Every structure is written in structure tokens, then in C-alpha cells.
């Protein structure tokens, strides 16, 4: 097992990565919120909810509050959330607001949740069609990434999550990117050491960003949105998995950076080659109508400021800058998602 700690406004969070983790050490008397269909790793009172984005509703939130109240939870209690990213989002919001904050331990069970959603302190619920409209920043006491959960993960879901891993290398750590390129076959085979390295290094990289910009006030945390400006629009229009859309978005945004003179030409092709080896899409067979729909979504990106979108731009592998990019240039980047043949 490997572990590290990161600091934040509430103190320190322990992050553990390995197999057969001792959950009881982190929550001796847990109240367990667990995704339906998963075996509970802990004994104690539990509430089961469906996974997926639909769980991030006020109805689900009320059920969690009622569960905590029925169990007599107070500020010394610990909620242990076991599941994918959406359930962890809900749990974070619930723990951060119930009695103005109770203990929280997160147990992500998907690769995407491990390398992305679990770390950062964000909790939210959706309001109608608007995702994450109501939210909090609330850091957990511990994040327990037990790699045993990943052995039964469907192949497409596993590969999709690797887009976020590639993002860390592309934007923040060229050495990690090179390691991924050299070890991609072992990662795809889910070799224990390779998967542990993927999860551990991804979390270390993200933690280094969260530590210096916990509340998204300095612009540094924007780097975690590389590939997401275009990717979010692609995800909504084409119905891809999140990581698949981010993969397409990474390549499109790198091409945009090349066109604008920020990035050496050929970098986008190099990254696209790695993503293709992973089995992820790097372009889409899109109609003109679909591209226009995606462009219209970019106009409503939350990072937009007037005629510009404040977005992270990669200038070389492992390095980035925060730039105001004209909306027209971002719309042109959407054109890059279309396969040339």
C-alpha cells in the first residue's frame, strides 16, 4: 500500500492506494452510504442508493439526511461513501451540510472516481438539467482507493477513465506522460503495480493543485479542465462516456493551441497516438448540424467571460498557461473533433 497526505483548510486528508485496505481503521463506527449492487466493505448501518448522475438530486440528499438523523448522527459521526463519482459528490454535499459538517471517508469504486472525483473536496447536487448547480467545498478525512474494486470494472469504463490520467501527464507532468506511453500495455492489462502507479501518481498530481487553489480562487485549478471545454460539449451532443469525450476534447484543444501558436505542431498527433493505443476516440464522425449544436454549448461554458473563455492552454507537455481565448477560436476547436476521413 502507498499513502500520502495533502493539506487544506480543514486540516489534512490521508490518501491510501493499494489492495485489501483496512477500512475499519479509518471509521470504527461508520454510517455507510453505498451504491446499489456493491458489497459493503464495512459492518454497520447502511443506506443503498442507485449510482449515476441521477443520484445527485434533492430527493436523494433528503434520504441521506433522514438516514443520518435516524441513526442519531452528530458532529462526531463519520459517513463512509462507497461508490462511483456521482455518489461521492452527493455524500460530500451531505456530509458538509448535515449539522454543518460531519466526518467523511470516501471509498471510490471506479477508476474515474479514484483518479478524479474523489479528490478535490467538491460536493454537489443537480437542479433539473443543470449539473452541480448547488454545491460545497468539503474535504474528506480519508480517501481509500482499494484496487480490488477495479478488477470487475467493464473494459470500456476502465479505458474511458484513462483519459483523465493522460490529461494529468499532458498538462502537468511530462515524466508521467512518458511513463504512461512506455507502460500503456501493462496498464490496460490491469497489472497491479501499473494500476497502483496510475492511481497514486494521478492523485498526487491533483492534490498538488488542490492544495494551492482549494476554492478555485486563484485560477490554478483551471488546469484540471484541460480537454473539458470541448469535451463537455461533445459529451452532451454525442452521448459518449465522460472520459471518451475528454479524450476527443484533449486532442481538439491541443490542435487549437497549435493553431494559435502556443504549442509545437505535432504534439496533438503524438497525444492522439497514445489515446488511440488506450482504445479511446480522438475524433468523431459528426454532421454539420451536430457540430453547430456543440458550438452553441461552448457559448454557455461557465468559464466564459464576455467574448472570451478563460481556459487552460497546454504550451508543451507538462506545462500550461491560463489564457483568455476568444469564443470564436473555441468554436473552431469544436471543428477539430470531426474525423477527417
Swiss-Prot record:
The keyword Amino-acid biosynthesis applies. Pathway: Metabolic intermediate biosynthesis; chorismate biosynthesis; chorismate from D-erythrose 4-phosphate and phosphoenolpyruvate: step 2/7. GO terms for biological process: amino acid biosynthetic process; aromatic amino acid family biosynthetic process; chorismate biosynthetic process. Its cofactor is Co(2+); Zn(2+); NAD(+). It comes from the Archaea. It is found in: Cytoplasm. Zn(2+) binds at residues 164, 228, 242. NAD(+) binds at residues 85-89, 109-110, 122, 131. It is an enzyme of class 4 (lyase). It catalyses: 7-phospho-2-dehydro-3-deoxy-D-arabino-heptonate = 3-dehydroquinate + phosphate. Its EC number is 4.2.3.4. HAMAP family: DHQ_synthase (MF_00110). This is 3-dehydroquinate synthase. It comes from Pyrobaculum calidifontis (strain DSM 21063 / JCM 11548 / VA1).
Amino acid at each position: 500500500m502507498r499513502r500520502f497526505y495533502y493539506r487544506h483548510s480543514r486540516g489534512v486528508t490521508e490518501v491510501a492506494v493499494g489492495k485489501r485496505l483496512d477500512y475499519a481503521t479509518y471509521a470504527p463506527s461508520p454510517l455507510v452510504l453505498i451504491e446499489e449492487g456493491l458489497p459493503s466493505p464495512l459492518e454497520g448501518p447502511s443506506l443503498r442508493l442507485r449510482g449515476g448522475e441521477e443520484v445527485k438530486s434533492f430527493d436523494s440528499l433528503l434520504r441521506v439526511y433522514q438516514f443520518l438523523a435516524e441513526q442519531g448522527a452528530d458532529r462526531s459521526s463519520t459517513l463512509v461513501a462507497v461508490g462511483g463519482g456521482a455518489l461521492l459528490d452527493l455524500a460530500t454535499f451531505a456530509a458538509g451540510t448535515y449539522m454543518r459538517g460531519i466526518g467523511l471517508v470516501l471509498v471510490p469504486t471506479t477508476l474515474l472516481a479514484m483518479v478524479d472525483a474523489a479528490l478535490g473536496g467538491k460536493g454537489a447536487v443537480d437542479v433539473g438539467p443543470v449539473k452541480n448547480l448547488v454545491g460545497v467545498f468539503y474535504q474528506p478525512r480519508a480517501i481509500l482507493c482499494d484496487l480490488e474494486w477495479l478488477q470487475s470494472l467493464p473494459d470500456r469504463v476502465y479505458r474511458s477513465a484513462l483519459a483523465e490520467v493522460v490529461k494529468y501527464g499532458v498538462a502537468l507532468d511530462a515524466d508521467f506522460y512518458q511513463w504512461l506511453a512506455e507502460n500503456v500495455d501493462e496498464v490496460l492489462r490491469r497489472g497491479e503495480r501499473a494500476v497502483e502507479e496510475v492511481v497514486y501518481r494521478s492523485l498526487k498530481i491533483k492534490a498538488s493543485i488542490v492544495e494551492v487553489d482549494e476554492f478555485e480562487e486563484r485560477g490554478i485549478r483551471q488546469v484540471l479542465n484541460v480537454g473539458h471545454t470541448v469535451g463537455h460539449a461533445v459529451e452532451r451532443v454525442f452521448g459518449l462516456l465522460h472520459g471518451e469525450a475528454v479524450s476527443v476534447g484533449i486532442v481538439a484543444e491541443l490542435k487549437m493551441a497549435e493553431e494559435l501558436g502556443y504549442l509545437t505542431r505535432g504534439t496533438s498527433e503524438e497525444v492522439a497516438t497514445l489515446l488511440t493505443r488506450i482504445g479511446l476516440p480522438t475524433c468523431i464522425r459528426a454532421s454539420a448540424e451536430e457540430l453547430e449544436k456543440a458550438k452553441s454549448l461552448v457559448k454557455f461554458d461557465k468559464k466564459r467571460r464576455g467574448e472570451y473563455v478563460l481556459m487552460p492552454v497546454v504550451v508543451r507537455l507538462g506545462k500550461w498557461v491560463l489564457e483568455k481565448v476568444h469564443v470564436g477560436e473555441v468554436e473552431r476547436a469544436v471543428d477539430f473533433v470531426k474525423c477527417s476521413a
